Amino acid sequence: MSSQKRQSTLSRFFTTIKPSQSTESTLTEKVSSKSPPLPPPPPPPTASPSLPSEKLLEFGFDGTKDSTSTRTTTTKSKDVEKRKSTTSSGSSFSSESKPKRPKEKRLTPLEKQILELTEQHQDKILLIQIGYKYKVFGINALKVSKILNIMYISNDIEDTRFHYCSIPDTRLHIHLQRILSHGYKVGVVKQIESTIVKQIEKTSKSSDVMRREVTGVYTKATYLGDESNENTKGSWDGLSSSSSSSSSDVPEYIVCINEVSEKQFAIVAVQPLIGEVIFDSFKDDISRQELETRLLYLRPVEVIVITNGSSEQISGPTLMTLKLINHNCNIIHKSGSPSENGNENENENENEAIEAIMSKYLNEKLVEYYSINFSIPIQQCFEYLLLYLNEFKLTNIFTIPENITNFQDSKKYMILPANTLNSLEIFTNTTDHTTKGSLFKLLNNTKTIFGSRLLQKWVSRPLVHIQDIKDRHQAIEDLQSEYNHVVDSISNFLTKIKYLDLEGLLSKIHYSSTNNNNNNLRINRKQVYLLLSNLQEILILVQKFEKSIKSFKFKSSLLIQIFDELLTISQTDIIIIENFLSMIDLSFIDCKESSEQCRKFFKRNSFDSIELQYQNIAQYQQQIEQEQLEIIRKELGNSKLKYVQKDGERYLIEIRNNQRDKLSKILDDKDYILIKSTQTITRYRKKSVTEYLKLLQYHEEMLIKTCDEEFQNFLKDLDSNYTLFYKIIKNLAIFDCLLSLTTTSSLPNYTRPTLIDDDLTILVKQARHPTIEQLRPNYVANDININIEYDKNRVLIITGPNMGGKSSYVKTVALLTVMTQIGCYLPCQNATMGIFDSIFIRMGANDNILKGYSTFMMEMLQCKNIISMMSNRSLIILDEIGRGTGTIDGISLAYSILKYLIESEFKPLVLFITHYPSIHVLEQEYPNQLVVNYHMGYQEIKNNTPGEIPEIIFLYNLCRGVVNNSYGLNVAKLAGISHDIIKQAYRVSEKVKSDIELKEYWKFAHSLNKALKEGGSSSPNQLDDIDYYILSKHSSL
């Protein structure tokens, strides 16, 4: 029979086999009855693909993977041949033939199991373990095959529910992360029993399918890294798998937003990787500026939005804000019943309902804590997050109150609004939205993942207490002052663990400690050992330098606290870590297989239950390797006979084929089972050995099960010391951040600022923009002289040519303020800085099409928010207010807004950039230099050619006075606009100026004529105006 015809026979056989003769592994895709309509299956290929022996094994024909013996299927092949279609094996249905509906047939046990699982989990993609592969069935298989670029297999099965794609079980987490990155929720279904355990314990009928359960559910934000693949080289040598997601610079938050009313909001955010919980309540308007600020900090990948009972959908402004922050964000809508306007009884009922749900996941003490300390809208967020995270086994995140923080703790931190974060490019630049050129990129010299995470919090929330700021400045000075071998040693240690996220590993232990399912632990054994061994190493290092630490002359209380706490722990609590490590057998490090790591992780004498299983294994090994082997030697008359192991089959005996005939009667009489035959030898196993081998395999399975149970208990004991471990890691993170700021502060020409708490002084000599100077070494420095001690220079009106450096100057002022209060030195010769509690910036032309707002509307909304939120310690920067509308309206609004800020009772510090020359009159309206006009310096070079614009040279330095010309035509020339267009624009510009001057002359002539006619009746003020006009015109000529 030809190869093609033989393959056609097999292919036909797979589709027509009776249920009683089928195997589990002949399955393909599954689509539940509630799934959307499926596309038609792809036409079969013109030639059937070959099915080598490896492919048959994949389908389960090896007798070890939920399958019947291959011999059974072979005996039926002739019957299948008779039922073959008369059509050729490679042909498909003709175009004229009608598609046939799949024949109704009884489903195999595995098919039924797959359908039941997918019916129960229609909201997720299921990766189902079958043998040594994970398979995806139905329409989900089509999605996954495209994501992973793997084969989508139909095998000519008409029922598309059983078309599938598959991945090796050893590559589960690698492929899982790729699927999650596309926004899907994924469930992992594992076989939770083995064939041998099933046979020995007889837990179910022998014909039943293997038990399978969903052991883990994941999304992009709830996946905490490679939790079980201990056979990955990177998880040990590179230390990088401790938290694959933690390596990202942007934390992945899950946020719950409660729309209590149109203007009142509550929010709770969780970061599962490190167990952080952030809450807040705030008022907002239709622009959702406050919500946008919080979302920019959190950058959520999953959002739950709770709306009140009267609203059936998320409000438009909220939805648009979410999409603008992250258009790939997964948004879940929940209907709630916020009780902002309810009466007392309604509040009590709501509170009781929330407590009833929370009590299912938290103990009574914690439920009471949440009920007492948080408002009902915040409690509702906690409630929905508990319900949501329960599916992912992450409710433990709410069991550590110390990890819960308030977003806007105004007593300790300055909260930078969304516009400020974007305009100052704090975390990302405005060009390609990467970290290049951002302030965080400049400051982030951390050596560890958890240190970088903490520094991000420091940058996003500058300090407002002068003593806290001085402590960080002093720490930098102490670290800079002289070489310290202790500091250098700890710094080297942090460099060594740069890929190991100790904070993330500790959170994984916390989640796993209450997870009773050993198939879904969040952390593996190598990661546990790495955590403990590195914590021990740093404490031993501190012990080694005990005398040096005690003799430190640090002035910084922050550094003193770090070393004192580490030294105390090294003296009193290191024994706890040592006790845990004493239970671990270090030989497991060299094990490659995860089952071998499991067996060898603990020392045998650490747990009686493990030792008992080893004794059982030794008993059956002795039966096979000594007693049974002796019997075999006597029966076969070979005293030197030894067992061999081939292809994973243990305890085989080999007999050469030329001796097989002599021993055939003994082999038959003594129950020797033929295992495999080759051209030269035949391998057997004695039936009694097979029985003992089953018992041996059973106890080996029991050993793994017992080791897993003891590992679970081990994690619970570790979690009971969570506070101790967290204190060590937190101190290391703070030290890492201080080293990072020290590195930046050690750049050339950086200096420590002098702090003043009494007023909003900003006095800086030769200030430089911190990020631009890294990109442009020839950056022009400027002095900053803002001293409002006597209410002088409180408002700066800045004019000047386009591209003259106005925006760069005001951004420098703001960035130096932020850097000061983060605790970093400044790029300047010297500086005296006041302490601000807020920085507001309105800069740039930003329309918002999705929100339906024009540039001018966004401008006015942002100005309104600034006016409503400013304080007596605010720095306000406004850039070209009023340019989004007509000139008259723009000037009027710019003048009025600035005048309001000048006269406000809060007296904020204001930097006002404008191209409206008439605004400069405010300097004359307010005496004592309260308002001062400045402009960016330039040099104009006259062009003698008629009709040609003058050339200008930008000097980029700040000068006193006002400039009336913005030199926009010069910018157009730099941009490459056609010379003819620029010449035409220059002629129009000159004509407009001439017309304006002519009108002013006519006005002057009219006033002069009137004065002459009236003789001496003219008022002194009127005559003064005429004199002033004549003098001004004369000086201009």
Curated annotation (Swiss-Prot):
Q: Which GO terms describe its cellular component?
A: nucleus
- The disulfides recorded in the entry are none
Q: Where is this region: Disordered?
A: 1-107, 229-249
**Ranges of Pro residues composition bias in the record:** 36-47
Q: Which UniProt keywords apply?
A: ATP-binding, DNA damage, DNA repair, DNA-binding, Nucleotide-binding, Nucleus
UniProt record, GO biological process = mismatch repair; mitotic recombination
Q: What residue spans carry the Low complexity bias annotation? A: 66-75, 86-96
Reading the lineage from the top rank, the first entry is: Eukaryota
Q: Does the keyword DNA repair apply?
A: yes
One MF annotation (Gene Ontology) recorded for this entry = double-stranded DNA binding
> What is the stated purpose of this protein?
Component of the post-replicative DNA mismatch repair system (MMR). Heterodimerizes with MSH2 to form MutS beta, which binds to DNA mismatches thereby initiating DNA repair. MSH3 provides substrate-binding and substrate specificity to the complex. When bound, the MutS beta heterodimer bends the DNA helix and shields approximately 20 base pairs. Acts mainly to repair insertion-deletion loops (IDLs) from 2 to 13 nucleotides in size, but can also repair base-base and single insertion-deletion mismatches that occur during replication.
Tell me the protein family, please: Belongs to the DNA mismatch repair MutS family. MSH3 subfamily.
Q: What protein name does the entry list?
A: DNA mismatch repair protein MSH3
Q: Which organism is it from?
A: Candida albicans (strain SC5314 / ATCC MYA-2876) (Yeast)
Lineage start: Eukaryota, Fungi, Dikarya, Ascomycota, Saccharomycotina
Underlying gene: MSH3
